[in-house]
Amino acid sequence: MSANASALAGAVLAGGESRRMGRDKARLRLRGETLAQRQVRVLREAGAEPVVIVRRAEQRMSVRAVEQVCDEFVGAGPLAGVQAALKAAAAAGARWIAVLAVDMPAIEAAWFGDLRRACRKGKGAVVRHADGFEPLAAIYPINALATAERRLRRGERSMQRFVAALVRQRKMRVVALPEEERWRVANWNRPEDRDRERRKHA
């Protein structure tokens, strides 16, 4: 069975501390909407419902009609965000969750359409390129929750190792990303990244 709209939840990971950017990335604006609003829209256009935002407890953001959840494993990085997303999706009765980092504004709904077509027999899907997996724009099966929690309790935070473990467990399928498509997974880390993207759409 492939992932379908009724079985697919979504989560925007917005809990990073944005040290290099100097301000909360989730509240940066691009083409009239905040990055948090944009990523929620992209996930919904991809057929994900419900969509949640995973954030730090002290963060405040205004995105209408979207549940916000906080990291359970505080300070444990993106893996803690994925764990919180998986837990929320499991509570909603979803079989898969599409996860998208708030600072990847080149990802469009079609990205998840391609991944959904790879989700067979309950497996999730992740893109891999020359530098490794792209774990923050991926579809995870809900049964990845136990693996995430087990690794976090052991103090392990590596997203690359987490995804590699899921691939070994045959819970994730790998989709190759051509080198000429690498621009799609660029993220905003510094103010110059934001400014460069804004100039494209000026």
Swiss-Prot record:
Entry-linked SUPFAM superfamilies: Nucleotide-diphospho-sugar transferases
CDD domains assigned: MobA
InterPro entries the record matches: MobA-like_NTP_Trfase, Molybde_CF_guanTrfase, Nucleotide-diphossugar_trans
A GO BP annotation: Mo-molybdopterin cofactor biosynthetic process
Binding site for Mg(2+): 103
A molecular-function term among this protein's GO annotations: molybdenum cofactor guanylyltransferase activity
Residue positions binding GTP: 13-15, 25, 71, 103
Known role: Transfers a GMP moiety from GTP to Mo-molybdopterin (Mo-MPT) cofactor (Moco or molybdenum cofactor) to form Mo-molybdopterin guanine dinucleotide (Mo-MGD) cofactor.
The protein's name in its UniProt record: Probable molybdenum cofactor guanylyltransferase
Species of origin: Opitutus terrae (strain DSM 11246 / JCM 15787 / PB90-1)
